[in-house]
Amino acid sequence: MFKWLHKKKDTMNRSKQTVMSDITPAHIEVLKENEIFVFGSNLQGIHGGGAAYIAKTHFGAIMGCGVGLQGQSYAIPTMQGGVKTIKPYVDEFIEFAKAHTEMHFLVTRIGCGIAGFRDEDIAPLFQNAISLANISLPKEFIDIILAQ
């Protein structure tokens, strides 16, 4: 994995440098010992499809547990309502990641599959994660955050 350094112009035409976290691979089949697969879930913890199913079958997600760290996975609920209902769980995840710098979190495109949200809906929720060295985000999310 590698770090990205992007320059962005703000509305005042000043140059900003934003240190980028690693980009989450599009397909994750194997994790290193310290890596955590971050996926979209439902509050009931029924990990029946999409990234949730992968988390259950490969990375230790527990049926019946819809939030937080489980094995080498971390569940963020995305199926309970609109984007506003997802934000507190993303904020909680970011605080968890800050407290656990020994772990590296690979965030998938949560909410952008079965839950039916667009990258443009979800990416801004991760604005405060973009500079954290132990959180990788999907390229789609990074591009949207940098464009803001």
What spans do the regions from the language model cover?
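Macrodomain-like recognition of ADP-ribose-binding/processing modules
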Residues: F2-Q148
